[in-house]
Every structure is written in structure tokens, then in C-alpha cells.
Regions:
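A short, histidine- and acid-enriched strand-loop-helix "catalytic/donor-clamping" loop
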Residues: 86-87, 104-122, 131-134
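Nucleotide-activated donor-binding/catalytic signature segment of Leloir-type glycosyltransferases, i.e.
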Residues: 226, 233-254
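Conserved donor-binding/catalytic core segment of Leloir-type glycosyltransferases
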Residues: 182-202, 208-211
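Short hydrophobic beta-strand element within catalytic cores of glycosyltransferases
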Residues: 289-298
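Acidic donor-binding loop of glycosyltransferase active sites
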Residues: 262-275, 288-289
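Donor nucleotide-sugar binding/catalytic pocket of nucleotide-sugar-dependent glycosyltransferases
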Residues: 132-181, 187
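A charged, aromatic-enriched C-terminal amphipathic alpha-helix characteristic of glycosyltransferases
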Residues: 332-366
Length: 370
């Protein structure tokens, strides 16, 4: 029996799990028009795939052309799709399914519940969760909140997230200590890394402020920003104002994963003052722990990879003094051992944040029509 899958964008970071699903089931894939902002996979890597047009593309509220018609195709009795709150085609799809196609099974892959929803968002999400047969959340935090709201544990599952795990695992096995930072900074101070786009929502200026505070207290750290973005000029200026220029390396965007692996492996700590997202999975894959904020309603699901004192720490949301303290606390832990921390990070990703974990969740929990 065929399964109909629909996702808004064929994001390349999901290539591994999509291929596993494609191999496990007889799938027809549908995606929204390719996005200019997201790196997309070649959908030809999937057996049967189609791009659907988007109306009002690029706006918050839009619609997907042809989505509703998929519900009327007799060959589809099981659906697996994302749950787009602002896709105007999705809500008629849900209503028609609830009224006329109750025997068909609808599974959604969504963030779930944040805890910061507006009244309208809350109403829409609750209706969606009521109608669907299976809810695959990105993380256990959202799953826990939905269970507390009364949804059945037989309906809600944590599918987590992943990157190109197999390729990164091959690179991880090749890593060793190098002098990539010693040769650049000409010191042996601990190095803080951030890997990703330099955007305002990530509050990357807080790293500079925290390191400046620590410097005043006699604690010296290097910073490397691996990535480009609209905040780069501001960050470079701020580094000069704080007299940190010799401690900060603006490496720029790097699309060479082998080089990224070396930079992350040899760094001592990743600091993500804003939403951490897949940066946590990326850096832990190569053994680097993470410090990020503790306001989970405003986090991305991957914050769950941070296990205090094992794979990282949390600081008080928006509080630069707390961030500085947690950076210092990380390196002053009793029995601090860099290699043991690497192993903790490896175990977290190898256990919870990879496509093998994800396909296992799908195989055991996907609601399939008779």
C-alpha cells in the first residue's frame, strides 16, 4: 500500500531519513516549491517525487496547490506530512479528512507544543492534534507537554532530528588534535566556537560580552565564528570596541565538512546564546559540548541534547552575566576531562539524534490504514 508524504521543502539535512523511509515503504513524495533560503536535496534520489506549486510564495500565509486533491486519491489511505499552521490548504485538508475520510490515517511531523502559542495558534494546533492519528514531535519536551494536555502516549512520539550522520561519522573517526587554533591565535587558551549563520536572533553579540567579562576577571578565551551573515560587520566592530580582536577569528562560511569537523573537534565549547537548533547536533557529533539558554519555550528542539555537566550547560535567558558564569563553570568542573566530554557528546548523538533512531520511531509508530 502506498504512503503519501508531503513536506514544505525538501531540505537537504533530511536526506538520510527521507531515503530510509523511501526504502522502508512504498512512497509517493510531494514537496512545496524549492526555497531560495534552504539548501534542498535533489528529489530524484527518492523513487516517486513531485513538486507542488505555492500560492502567495514567500509570505507567512500561503497555500499549496494540489494538496487537497491528494486526499481524494483512492490509492492513498495513509498520509505522513508536516503540519503547517499558516498553509491555507492544510486546514480544508484536515476538515475534509475528519468529515469524510475517517478511515484514512494521517500522521504529522511537527514541532508540537512550545508553550508560547497565541490564542489563535493554540486553537488551530489543538484542532490539528485532535484530527490526526499520529503526532511525531521533534523532541521530548513537546511530547511531554502534549501528554500533560491529555493526548494519548499511543498518539504522540518524539522523532527528534538529524543531519548527514553516516558521512559525519566517517569524518569523526578521522579526527585528532591539531594546532588549528594555536597556529591562528598563538596561544593555548580554550576556544569557544559558533557554527552557523550570523543572524540577530542568535544573539551572538552575547558571546563577545561574556568573554569580555571573563577577560576582566583574568580568564582568557578565544572565539571562532564559523559562518557569515548580516551580523558579521556589527560583531567585528563590537570585538574591536571590547578590545577582543586578537581573541576573535571570523572564519567565514565553510562548506567543507571535513574542515568543519576539524574546527569543531578542536574547539572546547560551542556557545549558542539564542536558539541552538541543529548546531547542537552538528557540534556534538564531533565531540564539542554546548552552552545555550534555558527558556525552553523559545528554544529549538535540539536543546534537549544538552545534558547539564555532561554535554553542556544552560544559562539564564538573555543574561550575559549568567552566560559568562556558565562558561567559567564549564571549565572549572571537578575532574574536567576533555576526552570524556567528547565521548558524552558522541553518545548523545549516536543514541538520539540520527536517522537510525528516527526510522525506528517511524517503523514502530506510524499509523497505517488497513
Amino acid at each position: 500500500m502506498k504512503i503519501c508524504l508531503f513536506f514544505n521543502t525538501p531540505s537537504i539535512y533530511r536526506e538520510a531519513i527521507y531515503k530510509m523511509i523511501d526504502k522502508e515503504y512504498d512512497c509517493d513524495w510531494f514537496f512545496g516549491e524549492l526555497s531560495d533560503d534552504v539548501k534542498c536535496l535533489d528529489i530524484k534520489c527518492l523513487k516517486h517525487s513531485t513538486i507542488l506549486g505555492i500560492g502567495n510564495k514567500g509570505r507567512r500565509v500561503y497555500w499549496t496547490k494540489g494538496l487537497i486533491s491528494l486526499l481524494f486519491k483512492k490509492k492513498y489511505k495513509t498520509y505522513f506530512m508536516y503540519g503547517p499552521t499558516w498553509d491555507l490548504s492544510f486546514w480544508p485538508f484536515l476538515i475534509i479528512k475528519a468529515l469524510f475520510f475517517r478511515k484514512k490515517k494521517l500522521n504529522i511531523w511537527v514541532h508540537g507544543w512550545y508553550g508560547k502559542e497565541t490564542w489563535l495558534e493554540g486553537i488551530l494546533k489543538k484542532f490539528m492534534f485532535h484530527v490526526v492519528d499520529g503526532i511525531f514531535c521533534y523532541g521530548d519536551y513537546a511530547k511531554k507537554m502534549l501528554l500533560e494536555m491529555g493526548y494519548s502516549k499511543d498518539k504522540v512520539f518524539a522523532i527528534h532530528n538529524s543531519l548527514n550522520y553516516d558521512e559525519q561519522l566517517t569524518l569523526r573517526k578521522k579526527q585528532h588534535d591539531t594546532e588549528v587554533y594555536k597556529s591562528h591565535f598563538h596561544n593555548e587558551n580554550p576556544t569557544i566556537i559558533f557554527l552557523g549563520r550570523l543572524t540577530s536572533i542568535k544573539r551572538l553579540d552575547m558571546i563577545l560580552d561574556a568573554v569580555s567579562i571573563l577577560k576582566q576577571n583574568g580568564q582568557l578565551f578565544n572565539i571562532v565564528y564559523v559562518g557569515n551573515g548580516p551580523m558579521r560587520d556589527m560583531l567585528e566592530h563590537k570585538a574591536k570596541v571590547l578590545c577582543l580582536s586578537d581573541q576573535v577569528w571570523f572564519y567565514g562560511a565553510c562548506y567543507d565538512e571535513e574542515k568543519n569537523a576539524e574546527l569543531v573537534y578542536n574547539a572546547d565549547l560551542c556557545v549558542a546564546p539564542g536558539n541552538v537548533g541543529l548546531t547542537a547536533v552538528h557540534t556534538m557529533m564531533f565531540g564539542c559540548p554546548v552552552v545555550t539558554h534555558d527558556n525552553f519555550a523559545y528554544q529549538m528542539p535540539e536543546f534537549e541534547a544538552v545534558k547539564p555537566s555532561k554535554t553542556g550547560l544552560f544559562f539564564d535567558f538573555g543574561n550575559v552575566e549568567s552566560l559568562a558564569n556558565q562558561i567559567a563553570n564549564w571549565f572549572s568542573q571537578d575532574n574536567y576531562k576533555r576526552e570524556a566530554i567528547r565521548e558524552n557528546c558522541y553518545m548523545e548523538v549516536d543514541t538520539n539524534w540520527n536517522p537510525y533512531y528516527q526510522i525506528d520511531i517511524v517503523k514502530h509508530n506510524l499509523k497505517i490504514a488497513d
